[in-house]
A protein has these predicted regions:
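A structural boundary/capping signal
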Residues: 1-327
């Protein structure tokens, strides 16, 4: 198959000329391999963490052929991989990670273990660990490199994909992929997992700690509320969502909002409604005015140089958004 085969507009890269973002945010997950201790040391949203990585898991050369992938899979299956999986699951529970955060963590671990030239070892390791966590993932090959093929619970935009048995498999690799580049899938489905990776936040991510909250002043909110207003935002969370895959708006609107952030917003609005003795109808109109006029209007391309729907915390952090974020 080619990368464009069976794909439609929702998966293809945008043909709009990209601008330059106003500010770049770094992913708040840093990983390095500690070979002497057989583990990966992490700076995870400001917290030190350690994930065991047994030498028995370390793969030698893997080529982008099904036989080589099968041999690597067998080695990993016979390795001491459970401590690694248990450590990742433990971090998932402690920090309230969603599925995309788990994938990002697994990816960072594999990149700490293997150099940039060892793309295939990275991809096989990612596929193996995610499958042990019951996620449905596959791999394919593009030229000499393996790529991850990931189905999602939601529709994803601006990422190329192929369709296999009515399931969209989104392509994540380490090299640019042309629209006519042949992509080969393997007949053997190594992963037995059935869970689709979801982009939604069904619970609050506990990352960064209280010291990482940044007080953000909102001049337009202050003007509408009639007093100075600021809101605490978990900066590591905003850094994490900066490069988030683009999905349907409901993914953003239905995601859980940070507790400290929501309490501050609700407290400020509630006090204004009570202070002014608003009726229910007046309160609704007031809140709608706040949502529609409390942010500077900026297009995605002005802010980020690309299409990017915003989570609620991001709208507050940047103090700007556009129509789709105000729905």
């Amino acid at each position: 198959k080619t990368a464009s085969e069976s794909s439609n507009a929702h998966g293809m890269p945008s043909d709009v000329e990209m601008g330059f973002p106003e500010a770049m945010l770094d992913m708040p997950i840093y990983a390095s391999m500690n070979s002497s201790e057989s583990n990966v040391d992490l700076d995870f949203f400001g917290f030190p963490e350690m994930v065991p990585f047994s030498s028995s898991m370390k793969l030698d050369e893997v080529i982008a052929k099904e036989k080589s992938v099968a041999q690597a899979w067998e080695q990993l299956s016979n390795s001491e991989y459970m401590p690694t999986v248990e450590a990742i699951n433990g971090m998932k529970d402690r920090y309230g990670l969603n599925d995309w955060a788990v994938y990002t963590l697994v990816k960072k671990i594999s990149e700490a273990v293997y150099d940039e030239s060892d793309v295939n070892q990275r991809v096989v390791t990612q596929m193996f660990l995610l499958s042990q966590m019951k996620y449905k993932v596959r791999t394919g090959s593009v030229g000499d490199e393996l790529v991850m093929l990931i189905p999602f619970a939601e529709q994803i935009y601006q990422v190329q994909y192929i369709t296999d048995k009515e399931l969209d498999m989104y392509i994540f690799g380490y090299s640019p992929l042309g629209t006519n580049t042949p992509l080969y899938t393997f007949t053997q489905d190594f992963s037995m997992g059935e869970k689709l990776i979801s982009l939604a936040f069904t619970q609050q991510m506990h990352v960064g700690g209280d010291m990482q909250y940044k007080k953000v002043n909102l001049p337009l909110w202050s003007e509408i509320l009639g007093e100075d207003f600021s809101v605490p935002i978990n900066k590591p969370y905003v850094e994490f969502t900066y490069d988030y895959p683009q999905s349907d708006l409901l993914t953003y609107h239905h995601s859980v909002v940070d507790t400290q952030t929501s309490k501050a917003v609700l407290r400020g609005v509630r006090l204004k409604i009570i202070k002014d003795g608003m009726t229910d109808e007046e309160a609704v109109a007031y809140i709608l005015n706040l949502v529609q006029n409390g942010f500077e209007y900026k297009t995605d391309y002005e802010m980020f140089g690309r299409a990017k729907p915003l989570f609620i915390e991001e709208s507050l952090y940047y103090g700007a958004n556009n129509c789709k974020d105000r729905v």
